[in-house]
Amino acid sequence: MTLRVVPESLAGASAAIEAVTARLAAAHAAAAPFIAAVIPPGSDSVSVCNAVEFSVHGSQHVAMAAQGVEELGRSGVGVAESGASYAARDALAAASYLSGGL
């Protein structure tokens, strides 16, 4: 099995991941207040208790979404580091062939 890696493509993929991460973070930030704060429809105890429970679940969702965005951002950094590593190794390999042939 052969794996062909184009470092420039990895750099482009990393930039795309970073852009998606930024858009996703902005969307979550805009939605967080609406997800985490549920207003009870009435003043009775059942409505208030349910609103509190939904607010707790909404806050948990916001926290998990933030962790997901953070993980996506780390993935983009990893792709960029892989591309840089491939490019550096390719340059070393090319230099060894050029210096050995002279």
Swiss-Prot record:
Pfam families in UniProt: PE
Is NAD given among the entry's keywords?
Answer: no
Gene Ontology terms, cellular component aspect? cell envelope; cell surface; extracellular region
Q: Which domain of life is it from?
A: Bacteria
Q: Which cell locations does it reside in? A: Secreted; Cell envelope; Cell surface
Say if the entry is tagged with keyword Secreted.
Answer: yes
The protein's matches in SUPFAM superfamilies, at most eight in alphabetical order, are given as: PE/PPE dimer-like
* Chain ranges of the PE domain: 3-91
> Keywords, A to Z?
Secreted, Virulence
Q: Which InterPro entries match?
A: PE-PGRS_N
Biological role: May play a pivotal role in the evasion of host immune response by M.tuberculosis. Mediates production of IL-10 via activation of the p38 and ERK1/2 mitogen-activated protein kinase (MAPK) signaling pathways.
Family assignment? Answer: Belongs to the mycobacterial PE family.
Q: What is this protein called?
A: PE family immunomodulator PE15
Q: Which gene encodes it?
A: PE15
